[in-house]
Structure formats: structure tokens, C-alpha cells
Amino acid sequence: MTKMIVGLGNPGDKYEKTKHNMGFMALDLLAKELNVDFKEEKPFMSLVASTFVNGEKLFLVKPLTFMNESGRAVAPLLKYYNIDEADLTVMHDDLDSPVGRVRLRQKGSSGGQNGIKSVITHVGSQTFNRVKIGIGRPKHGMTVVNHVLSGFDNEDKEIAQDGIFKAVDAMKFYLENGDFQKTMNKFN
């Protein structure tokens, strides 16, 4: 069985440390811990790393399409590698959770997250796993766009990093046992 873990974010140095790039940050850490490197796959508009974990093929994917078009990269990769959407996990930022809180879900709506909305649209299904990493709501007077495209202030930086570590621990646990429900029970 082949699995794919996608980290959502925006490409480029300008966005590297923004809240919207929590998925990229978590996937970068997971790739480092699995000792794999990303390479650009231009036909799929993505950075892709691959390895085997417990005898199963694993693809790590960072779409280069910008957040709101993530599905345009994810859907063709799933089709090309013949991966069922139930074996897809998407890591992303979550406005509705406090900074650093990690929540795992097996399916559902986008919850207003435009990258997830794009994946749902292009994959044609809501039945894929999600790892939501909390970034909190905007402070009074700040727009959602400005909030997600800003970095973490000093008081939240460490809490956000802890969330990334927890998300990666959850993915390593999932890759070891292959059971997302069991992973949800342990990490939610």
C-alpha cells in the first residue's frame, strides 16, 4: 500500500515562516527525520520526496501552486501513483484551534481552509486524513489574510514549534502502525 502525506503552504522565501505554512514546516521536519530530500517534479507542480517506511512506499509532497490551488497538484499525483484518497494525509494550518494545538480528522468539509477546499474539489472527495495545526484567530483589528500571512510573535513561536513536533510525532506513529483511527485516539 502506498501513502502520501501532503504539507500545505505557499512557496517562496516571502512565505516561509508564515502561519499559513505550518503544513510545509511540519512536512520539512518529517522529511528530515525520515532522512529524505525533496526534488522538484515540474509536471506535478510540487516538491516530492519518497521513501519506504515499514515496507510501504511513502510520498511526501509540497505543492508549489500556492495554497488556494493545492488540489491542482495533489489530485494528479494521487492518480499517477494510483493512491486511494483514504491513504492521503494533508497537514495544514487551522485558524479554529489555539496556536500549537494539533487535531487529526479522517474526513469532513474544508472548515474554510482554502487549501483543503481545493484538495476536496480536485480530488473529488472529502474522505482523506487531515492533521490540523492550530494558528489561532487574528487579534482584534487584523484581517484573516494578514493573520495567516504573518509570522508568529515571540510568545507564540515556541508553542507553534511544539505543535509542529506533535504533528510530526503523530505522522511517525501513523506510519509505524498504519491505522489513522488509532493515531487519532492517541494524539487528539
UniProtKB/Swiss-Prot annotation:
Domain of life (superkingdom): Bacteria
Site feature: Discriminates between blocked and unblocked aminoacyl-tRNA: 10
Keywords: Cytoplasm, Hydrolase, RNA-binding, tRNA-binding
Residues given in the record as tRNA binding sites: 15, 66, 68, 114
E.C. number(s) listed in UniProt: 3.1.1.29
Listed Pfam families: Pept_tRNA_hydro
GO terms assigned for molecular function: peptidyl-tRNA hydrolase activity; tRNA binding
tRNA-binding is among the record's keywords: yes
Site feature location: Stabilizes the basic form of H active site to accept a proton: 93
InterPro entries: Pept_tRNA_hydro, Pept_tRNA_hydro_CS, Pept_tRNA_hydro_sf
Disulfide bonds: none
Active site: 20
Reaction it catalyzes: an N-acyl-L-alpha-aminoacyl-tRNA + H2O = an N-acyl-L-amino acid + a tRNA + H(+)
Localization (cell): Cytoplasm
A GO BP entry: rescue of stalled ribosome
Cellular component aspect of the GO annotation: cytoplasm
Keyword field contains Cytoplasm: yes
Function statement: Hydrolyzes ribosome-free peptidyl-tRNAs (with 1 or more amino acids incorporated), which drop off the ribosome during protein synthesis, or as a result of ribosome stalling.
Self-association and partners: Monomer.
PANTHER family: PEPTIDYL-TRNA HYDROLASE
HAMAP family: Pept_tRNA_hydro_bact (MF_00083)
Family named by the database record: Belongs to the PTH family.
Name of this chain's protein: Peptidyl-tRNA hydrolase
Organism per entry: Lactococcus lactis subsp. cremoris (strain MG1363)
